[in-house]
Amino acid sequence: MDTSGIELKDTSAQHVAVGEDSLTVDLADGRTIAVPLAWFPRLLHATAAERANWRLIGPGEGIHWPDLDEDISVASLLAGRRSNETGESLRRWLDGRKAK
């Protein structure tokens, strides 16, 4: 079944929790999405304080972590998409963290 044309309603994020191993997002329609933190290396390498410092983008369309320069859309979580950051980009980001 092709789901590319399905309109997503009431899928805005309402609450976000980032644990040691998973990212959990509660949606307005009552669902909860949980994905492995390994899907998002910047979150995986972040401190607990950095993970806790998030804000919703727009009316819950996504989540932004200002300390990590990380943005994740609800649509990508629903589609099961992992971070598409390259290994080289992640290495540069990690090296920049060490320099601080």
Where are these regions (language model features)?
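Motif-centric detector for short Cys/His coordination patterns
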Residues: 1-100
